[in-house]
Amino acid sequence: FLLNLSINRKLPKSDGFRLYRNNESELYLCSVFFKYLVFIIIPKILNSFFSILFSPRETRYSVAYTYHQNHTKLLSQYIEIPNPEGRFLADPFVFAYNENNYIFVEDFFYKDNKGRISVIKIDGDKNEFLDVIIEEDFHLSFPFVFKENNEIFMIPESHENLDIRLYKCLEFPYKWKLEKILMSDVSAADTLVIKKEDTWFMLTNICSSKSIDHSELHIFYSDNLKSNAWKPIASNNLVIFDPLRGRNGGLFYHNEKIYRINQVHGQAHYGKSFNVNEIILLSKNEYIEKE
C-alpha cells in the first residue's frame, strides 16, 4: 500500500463506505438478519394476526377470593365473583368491618370506557354486589382502603385527573367524600401509604419519561396524612425503575412484617404475574425490600 502511494502520489480509489469489508462478513450479516426475521419479526406478526382473529374484542378481568391461613391454595380453588353485564371488576382490596368482609374493586364500564369504585360483601362462598360507591368524571381504579384513628380512608388511582386524592368514609361502605388532594399535576398510579411511628410513607408509580406505563416506584414521606407537601425520601436513594418490580399491586401485613405486592409486566403483556416482597427498611433516607 505504501509503495503504491509513493509511486502514484495518490490514494487508491475508494469503493465508498462499507459496514463490512468482505463477502464473509456480508454473509454473516444476512444470516443474523434471517434469524431475526424468523425468530422475532414473523412470530410477532403471527401473534398479532391470531390475536385479532381469536382474542376477545374487549379486555376482561375478574376478581376471585378464598379463605386460608397458609397462602398455599391454588387459584383454581378460589371463588370467582361474576362480572356485571357490560363491565369487569379488577384491583380488589379486602377490608374487614364489624366482623364482615368487604372487597372494594375497580368497576369498569365498557360503555364509557371508565372505571368507578364499587364494593362487594363476602360471606363464605356467597358474595353480594352492593353498589358503586365513588364515581367521578374521570377513570378511577386501585381502591387502596385503610383505617387510621377509627376513621376509614381510601386512595383510589386517579391518574387521568393528574392527582393523588384521599377520600374519607362517612357511612360505611356507601358514603364517601373527597377529603384532600395529596398531590397535584402528577400522573401517578396504584398509590399505597404506610404509617411507621409518626411518619407516613407514600409508595406510588410515576414515569420520569412522562409515558403512561407508570413502571417506576417513587417514595415520599410526610408527618401528616392529609398533607399536600409530600417530600421524596433522600435523593441518593434509587427509585425502582425495573418494570418487573416497580408497579404496585397491593400491600399486606403478616406476622408483624410488611409485604409489598408488585405487578410483573411482560413485553406487550400488562399484568403478566406478580411477586411478593418483604419491606426490610423504610425510612426518610432509604428503602430496601427483598423478594
Predicted regions and their residues:
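Carbohydrate-active catalytic/glycan-binding domains of CAZyme proteins
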Residues: 30-291
